[in-house]
Amino acid sequence: MAVKESYAGKINRKLNKKLHVIDVAAGRVPADLVLKNATYVNVFSNELCRGDIAVAEGLIVGMGEYHGKVEADVGGKIVLPGFIDAHIHLESSLVSPKEFAKAVLPHGTTTVITDPHEIANVMGTDGIEYMLQATEDLPVDVRFMLPSCVPATPLDESGANLD
């Protein structure tokens, strides 16, 4: 049986990750991965830029000149960030979160923000807990909104109320 991590342990682990990311971005320690000679879009200046892209803890932490534990020369190819779908109802897809991730990731969506009001209307907090657990280790980052309409209308008998 796995030992559950303490709240203090979780905070300490997350803090250490953030400090590592800062050190990599500042160039004090090597990145986990560096994409050398990449072409990327500067969305603020609307320019194509060329340089290295540093990755640490699964995050892009800097562009410029970096060294990494792993370096891959991408030969000037264009590198794009993942897409974010800012409002979905994941359960409306009628597939499990795992299958949903398999469908959207190949098309460039790496993050979704979902409003789980449908499953919350039917199952209440058990449904929301299921969604949280089912999205925990997916290759797509799933964030949740607080459902604003549970129950959907005063006339509906949905089966659940969130207090």
Predicted region positions:
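Divalent-metal coordination cores built from histidine and acidic residues
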Residues: A2-A25, K102-D163
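Histidine-rich, glycine-flanked metal-binding segment
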Residues: K10-P81
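Short loop/turn motifs at secondary-structure junctions and domain boundaries
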Residues: N42-N46, S93, E157-L162
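Short glycine-rich, polar/acidic loop-and-turn segments at beta strand-coil junctions
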Residues: T39, E57-L59, I88-L90, P116-E118, ...
